[in-house]
Amino acid sequence: MPGPFPGRVVKVHSARSIDEESRAANPDAVRQMLTAGMLALTGEKRKEDAWRRFISPRDVVGIKVNCSGAPQICTHPEVVAGIVENLTAIGVPASQIWVYERFANQLNSVNYPRYLPDGVHVEAAEGEYSRGTVLGYDPRTYVETSFFGEDDTRSNLVRIAAERFTKIINVPNSKEHQAAGVTGCLKNIAYGNFSNVARSHKSSKTFTYSFIGTLAAVEPIRSRTVLQIMDALAGVWHAGPFSRFPQFRFYPKQLWFGTDPVAMDHQLLDLVEAKRKAEGAVSLFDRSPEHLGNNRDPNRNAFIREPGHIEYASRLGLGVFDAAKIQVREVEL
Amino acid sequence: MLLLLAAALPSLLWDGPPDTAATLRQAGIERIQVPAAQYESWKSAGGLAVEAAHPDGAIQLSSPGVQYRANVASATTTPWLVGNGWRILRNPRGRFIYDAPGAKAALAAAEASCFGADAAVHTDAAGLKPFAEIISMLRAIGPNGPPVADIGFIDDGSPAAGEVINLLVRDNLLVKLVAKPDPAMKLNVAFGSKEFPKEEAGNPPMMAHDIRGHLTDERRSLRIFGSAVVVARLTAAPDGVRVHLLNYAGAERKIDGLRVRVLGRYPKSHVTAAGSPADELLDYSVDTDATEFTIRELKTYAVIDLAR
């Protein structure tokens, strides 16, 4: 990161990509969106060549999904299936593809295997009955810091990401986050790849401002994450990431493509901020203590949000934050 | 030597009638204390070593475990451990009694042994087998050496100081109570001194955190990663150290994976864990100044002997 296309974001919209009533994605529309997005991002004429810009048949590929609001909101299995279809089409064996998350209960609630060819692995770092285990993490790769005086000061990298993958495709979805402001590419690759991160929030204070970028910059995550595909078919504009309240969901019906997580997340910030404004909710940047409280109310939140984490990540060299330097290309299907 | 070891092991305090002897033997119990009034009737029970209990003057300890208090608002989400280590440290020559039903009998026996207490554990029928398993393990590992400590704590005997000692133990800060500053310690804490005033103990976690800050994590002889319900201790051994891991939630839930860091280079190791299969330590590494490893499973109690 930020890869070969710093500052570039391709947004593909298809009105038929998701049914708002059933929340089911349309696999054919998603396939077309994936092809259109990859061609627009790379400038290639054939989709196989576009995918080969990032992945070779020898690679062991981790697809980092986001299931923290599953099954209500998550990386759609149709999107993951479409990515896998393209990977196998360029010669990556199914057995060299992993769909992964940190928590098995969330991952399993989506039932990804039902959408994927035999042989693709679906794996969580922490099992259904062993939440909190360190066994799924690499003991040698960690960020050590103390936020609130906790005794366990380490956050370790997911073991399969450290030891097995040669490439990672990051596939978050478009959500507001009550601590970080939004949870997009950066947070999915950071908090979604390291253990013991919830310790960075306590009462209304969260250290996401600097911790997200710090984790995302850790090797080998930084260099192996070669492609960002934002699932913005559905989104959450308040009370994320878990989306317990359906009234705060919305449907951009888009997929975004890039290699620069900062540029992508700046776009996400704009998307969620615009939706909040349209709904009459306070800005993500609001820091008023009087707006702390039960987030059933769109003007209240459990934390003082830290949307500045995206700009902070840009200062670590993870991508382009300056809006004037971000080139957005929009594709309508 | 065997007699000495047996005397050092926690005893089972059993107030059931003599016709329960077979139940005890089946559970693996070999030695019991009974109320003095029942001693005569128990003398003829075969297959068990029976002593008369003398509870007068013994200190009653709490049943060890974890209180999650999920429905109670609090300043911390860290589970509250009910541990007795600090009370044992304060009374090194004391005699103690636990009332620990069920699987907590195992934790009580392990805690008593780990902190070097002369203790009897009163339990129920469900606690017999877990207790016997721990006693069998304690016999197998042999006696502990003297405790290894980083912090010398000059205790004024007050409840406030007691709570600070409790939190130091609970936070795995290896503490030894001393009468005056001990030059062998990395840090000496005089409770009530200008540096550690009594007023600060009004917020005991803050004081414990302050002490940790003075010591620094880098100088801690022992650290653990991956659980908020484990208390770790370190005792010296002829050619290394012995790591003790007590899972205070062990009566309800085992821990899958716990990372341990011990200062010093120890290329050799041996694990003994009650109720878990014999297992190799995972991801073992010996760096320039520390040894690290992961224990795959921790039920109630595990001991890792590390040697040079």
State each model region's role.
Chain B
Residues 4-198, 292-293:
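Glycan-processing catalytic domains of CAZymes
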Residues 150, 154-173, 186, 226-266:
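Carbohydrate-binding surface patches
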Residues 188-224:
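A glycine-rich, often tryptophan-bearing local segment used as a flexible ligand/cofactor-contacting loop or short
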